[in-house]
């Protein structure tokens, strides 16, 4: 099965509200902003044809500068008022010949080339794919402040990014 062309949409448009105002996509990891490390992971993956980074308007210039040497970065653009809107805008900015889309969080820089490649190849075969890990915490279903049930942890997976689909 030939590998379809895959474009990555890196979502980096958050408000940093959960980080006490610290912008996690620009926070340094080993001296390099997380969003630059994230973009580099996709830049260095042969399964990725192009990258669109969706961010806040005030971060377009600094992120563009960080990605200046990355030839797969097609656009660094403003996102929307929600994650869903930002993803939609990013998807619409991909080239018309892109057949698969990988959605990834800009503040998740430690994604490996192997994970990206496996997700693209799985989506190429099955239509969609996302990495997942078994849930370690006990999860409760709560309604009206009361615990209704406890799902069997063995049946639960925590889904991560990149989420790839055709």
What are these regions (language model features)?
Residues 68-100:
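Short phosphate-binding loop-to-helix
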């Amino acid at each position: 099965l030939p590998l379809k062309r895959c474009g990555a949409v890196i979502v980096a448009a958050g408000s940093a509200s959960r980080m006490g105002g610290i912008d996690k996509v620009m926070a340094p990891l080993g001296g390099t902003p997380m969003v630059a490390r994230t973009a580099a992971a996709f830049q260095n993956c042969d399964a990725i044809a192009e990258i669109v980074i969706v961010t806040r308007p005030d971060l377009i210039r600094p992120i563009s500068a960080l990605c200046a040497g990355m030839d797969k970065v097609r656009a660094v653009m403003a996102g929307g008022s929600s994650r869903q809107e930002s993803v939609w805008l990013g998807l619409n900015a991909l080239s018309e010949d892109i057949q698969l889309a990988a959605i990834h969080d800009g503040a998740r820089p430690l994604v490996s080339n192997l994970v990206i490649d496996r997700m693209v190849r799985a989506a190429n075969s099955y239509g969609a794919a996302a990495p997942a890990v078994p849930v370690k915490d006990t999860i409760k279903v709560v309604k009206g402040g009361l615990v209704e049930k406890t799902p069997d942890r063995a049946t639960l997976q925590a889904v991560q990014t990149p989420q790839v689909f055709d």
